[in-house]
Amino acid sequence: MAEEKKETMEEPKIGVYVCHCGVNIGGVVDVEAVRDYAAKLPNVVIAKDYKYYCSDPGQLEIQKDIKELGINRVVVAACSPRLHEPTFRRCVEEAGLNQFLFEFANIREHDSWVHMDNPEGATEKAKDLVRMAVAKARLLEPLEASKVSVDDKALVIGGGVAGIQAALDLADMGFKTYMVEKRPSISGRMGQLDKTFPTLDCSMCILAPKMVDVGKHDNIELITYAEVKEVDGYIGNFKVKIEKKPRYIDEELCTGCGSCVEVCPIEMPNYFDEGIGMTKAVYIPFPQAVPLCATIDKDYCIECMLCDEVCERGAVKHDQEPEEIEIEVGTIIVATGYDAYDPTEKLEYGYGRHTNVITGLELERMINASGPTDGKVLKPSDGEKPKRVAFIHCVGSRDEQIGKPYCSRVCCMYIMKNAQLIKDKMPDTEVTLYYMDIRAFGKGFEEFYKRSQEKYGIKFIRGRPAEVIENPDLTLTVRSEDTLLGKVTEYDYDMVVLGVGLVPPEGAETLRQTIGLSKSADGFLMEAHPKLRPVDTLTDGVYLAGVAQGPKDIPDAVAQASGAAARAAIPMVKGEVEIEPIIAVTDSDVCGGCEVCIELCPFGAISIEEGHANVNVALCKGCGTCVAACPSGAMDQQHFKTEQIMAQIEAALNEPASK
């Protein structure tokens, strides 16, 4: 246990510790010269250097000086605070010093790494950075973290394979978990697939048992055909409003017998079959649906009441209204999945105009035995089997012209999978793949790629097709450059399949703004750190899973979902979280209540109470936007107070180590 905190209102006694970081700093900067310079600065009682201060011996040396020399401020000149600031905060706290009486001078990323060709200049800059850190350290104040309690319930948004895995993991840990899915049944995109690559396992055979587990789990409350409309609060204490759309069927009474579907006279496009098949105005999405309950689409229903007449349980409720549900949870996992890219804007490929041009997901539903063609691959134009099929890779991916420069990571593999399945069903069919590069990066992927060539005889042409032309007989001519042969080719096909990429789902932007999340350049939700916090977000208590965070295959989505569940469980297990005190504070005597800070705060952490700004300590991230914008100077930021920053600036400008 840390020793009793030392009194810090006395005269500052500063210790400066300059790290070599092996040769990262020591190979460029004259560390000994920086150490000697620091020793002469006001209030510095000890200055030392060491090869690695982040190591145990280095930290023990700092702790020894705190205890024996009475040091009450510590400055470490080393690497990025992003990496080791928590390390040194713990170090000084274990020695009895408040952790916020520590200051970091970054002389690696800000100095040695960017001035490797100028050691002398780098050394002088290091002196400047250390002097600035010492100037701020003199004015540091002890701060104490606050704690907030955490509700031990969780919310999972999205009912695809990632959301299912996350919900089951949390529920198995004993936490009450709400799952919200916008469609009538959980399953996500995985439920639409026939087989999964590279093992060609039955997709629904893998997924359906997990779906059933979700529906039956005592700790999971499943809310389908619903969307999150409002999220207020902060980690441990989120208040969520959910709008549940009317099914016009009572979920508690419906047994999924299908009698209503049989008698319904109205047909409509089946969303689950990507619109290439038909269903009824009252429908059950697919046989394994969870919950197994019918839904009436009022856009098509003519209210003939035949469904009501045949329902023995009286489950049909034509007067059902939308329902607003309010829940309180401690943590949230966003697993909203993806949509397939709509290739209509790729006019050169003729999707939506050329009858026999379809997407990869539409082909998935054709191949599926429970799909609209009972597993037969048929040309949309005449219902006959195609003798020549072409696949075009990277439609909606790796294409800067349409603002989609990223790789969708699954297209190469799902195209080869479907090509193999076509050959299995129709061995005499000629299959050709037009590709830019084959990205077979996962376990078993390269072998899968080779099998496509060697066992199935699938033809590969390297090049992005320029145009797909529809001929009078509805065959299709694909004009493309073959970059390996260095010539333009034109081949005729009966059907062309577009390997469409993955894009953020409809409604993702609204949900992002509702929760207050960031997004990456490609539109997917952004993690807090790509390597160190890959499932966290910048909003504490909110985590990401699956393709919501970026394109990935099923194993990666499941692994990330389990990781997100584990991260979400940590604060709920503890029962409370510590809130760092580096936040904005308001001088109520100066604040005029102009609300400029409220408009600019990216985290919604400020409100007006009793005529002046009030900062919610749990929501504030200490970004300083309000401090910079406040016209009256009423806002300040702990640990980065105006006087502390000004002291650094004055130290940099008034006493430069070199001119």
UniProtKB/Swiss-Prot annotation:
Binding site for [4Fe-4S] cluster 3: 591, 594, 597, 630
SUPFAM superfamilies: 4Fe-4S ferredoxins, FAD/NAD(P)-binding domain
Domain 4Fe-4S ferredoxin-type: 244-274, 292-321, 581-610, 611-640
Residues annotated for [4Fe-4S] cluster 2 binding in this entry: 264, 301, 304, 307
UniProt cross-references to PROSITE patterns, sorted A to Z: 4FE4S_FER_1 (PS00198), 4FE4S_FER_2 (PS51379)
A GO BP annotation: methanogenesis
Co-factor note (free text): Binds 4 [4Fe-4S] clusters per subunit.
The entry's keywords: 4Fe-4S, FAD, Flavoprotein, Iron, Iron-sulfur, Metal-binding, Methanogenesis, Oxidoreductase, Repeat
Sequence positions that bind [4Fe-4S] cluster 1: 254, 257, 260, 311
Residues reported in the UniProt entry to bind FAD: 158-181
Gene Ontology molecular functions: 4 iron, 4 sulfur cluster binding; CoB--CoM heterodisulfide reductase activity; metal ion binding
InterPro entries, per the entry: 4Fe4S_Fe-S-bd, 4Fe4S_Fe_S_CS, AlaDH/PNT_NAD(H)-bd, FAD/NAD-bd_sf, FAD/NAD-binding_dom, HdrA-like
Pathway the protein acts in: Cofactor metabolism; coenzyme M-coenzyme B heterodisulfide reduction; coenzyme B and coenzyme M from coenzyme M-coenzyme B heterodisulfide: step 1/1
EC number: 1.8.98.5
Cofactor dependence: [4Fe-4S] cluster; FAD
Binding-site positions, [4Fe-4S] cluster 4: 601, 620, 623, 626
Catalytic activity: coenzyme B + coenzyme M + 2 reduced [2Fe-2S]-[ferredoxin] + 2 H(+) = coenzyme M-coenzyme B heterodisulfide + 2 H2 + 2 oxidized [2Fe-2S]-[ferredoxin]
Subunit structure: The heterodisulfide reductase is composed of three subunits; HdrA, HdrB and HdrC. It forms a complex with the F420-non-reducing hydrogenase (Mvh), which provides the reducing equivalents to the heterodisulfide reductase.
Sequence similarity: Belongs to the HdrA family.
Function: Part of a complex that catalyzes the reversible reduction of CoM-S-S-CoB to the thiol-coenzymes H-S-CoM (coenzyme M) and H-S-CoB (coenzyme B).
Record-given protein name: H(2):CoB-CoM heterodisulfide,ferredoxin reductase subunit A
Organism: Methanothermobacter marburgensis (strain ATCC BAA-927 / DSM 2133 / JCM 14651 / NBRC 100331 / OCM 82 / Marburg)
